[in-house]
């Protein structure tokens, strides 16, 4: 299948009447930008409609670095019924890579799901079936603004910037949902948690109360809270989830038989519960090795990654790095008098 065939498989344009369209292109490099713009152009009958459909290019993948939504602030000055449509290039690993899990070469050349420009061109040329163009579910500016105003302050001088960041985060949500249909449910991960919390109205009101009670400027408290978020917020990725599963398999093999015995019917029942309700899984363990069993079973059954709470003393070099990128949340053993830590 060549690139032209991929372009014709589906259209990035949403169903609409006379509404304008704003495309958000989630790109990591110039090649992905080229692919997505070519996809848009391929389905533009006259070519003139592109001028009525602004395109904002953002790298939405860096949770820690944040995102520069300045372009989006200006682009959102569009009619309220404008449809915002996010686009992304999804890269599937080779069947060999899926079966083997992360390999040494992946540490050298990077995650096969996130290739650079040169590697991406090579994959498209030699293994085009691994390249997918995906569009997230579109939504109107009006609907997004209504949802934003329910939980965020609109009086703040940074309201427009916060709204643009909110729109970008919603683009991540719908794109991740579309990509999981290709990659698998085990890769459902939270994104931009700290950024969402910092702009949340309820959280800001709680910080305001602490500022009033202690006399500490809010800006200083928010800076302190950002440090707590950096410690606690897990930043999982597809690569490290795969690596953690492989690591668990290796460790469990040191003390147990290769096959893990469990009740498949109970797993399916739990899947339904987790799908329909916020859930907390509690399991016993005699050793730290036992704590690897449940995450491994869930991974093998294509469950969303479970968040695992652990003491901050476990956040040491090596293991802390891995767990932080595989769903681990480290909290202090004692924070009785630290109200800011509690609300964070």
Give residue ranges: language-model regions.
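Membrane-interfacial terminal anchoring regions of lipid-handling membrane enzymes
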Residues: 1-344
């Amino acid at each position: 299948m060549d690139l032209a065939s991929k372009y014709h498989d589906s259209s990035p344009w949403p169903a609409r009447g006379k509404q304008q369209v704003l495309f958000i292109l989630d790109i990591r490099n110039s090649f992905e930008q080229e692919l997505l713009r070519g996809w848009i152009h391929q389905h533009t009958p006259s070519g003139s409609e592109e001028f009525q459909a602004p395109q904002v290019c953002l790298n939405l993948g860096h949770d820690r670095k944040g995102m520069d939504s300045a372009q989006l602030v200006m682009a959102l000055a569009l009619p309220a019924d404008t449809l915002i449509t996010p686009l992304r290039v999804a890269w599937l690993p080779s069947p060999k890579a899926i079966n083997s899990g992360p390999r040494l070469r992946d540490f050298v050349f990077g995650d096969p799901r996130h290739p650079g420009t040169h590697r991406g061109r090579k994959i498209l040329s030699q293994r085009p079936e691994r390249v997918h163009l995906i569009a997230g579910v579109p939504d109107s500016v009006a609907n997004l603004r209504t949802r934003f105003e329910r939980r965020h302050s609109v009086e703040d001088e940074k309201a427009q910037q916060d709204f643009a960041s909110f729109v970008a985060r919603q683009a991540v949500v719908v794109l991740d949902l579309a990509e999981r249909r290709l990659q698998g449910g085990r890769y459902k991960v939270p994104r931009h948690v700290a950024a969402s919390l910092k702009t949340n109205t309820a959280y800001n009101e709680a910080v305001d109360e602490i500022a009033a009670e202690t006399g500490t400027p809010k800006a200083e408290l928010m800076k302190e809270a950002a440090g707590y978020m950096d410690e606690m917020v897990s930043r999982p990725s597809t690569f490290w989830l795969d690596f953690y599963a492989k690591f668990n398999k290796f460790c469990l093999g040191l003390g147990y038989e290769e096959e893990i015995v469990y009740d498949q019917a109970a797993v399916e029942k739990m899947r339904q519960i987790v799908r329909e309700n916020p859930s907390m899984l509690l399991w016993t363990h005699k050793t730290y090795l036992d704590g690897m069993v449940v995450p491994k079973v869930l991974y093998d059954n294509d469950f969303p990654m479970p968040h695992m709470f652990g003491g901050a003393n476990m956040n040491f070099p090596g293991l802390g790095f891995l767990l932080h990128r595989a769903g681990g949340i480290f909290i202090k053993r004692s924070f009785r008098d630290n109200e800011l830590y509690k609300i964070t």
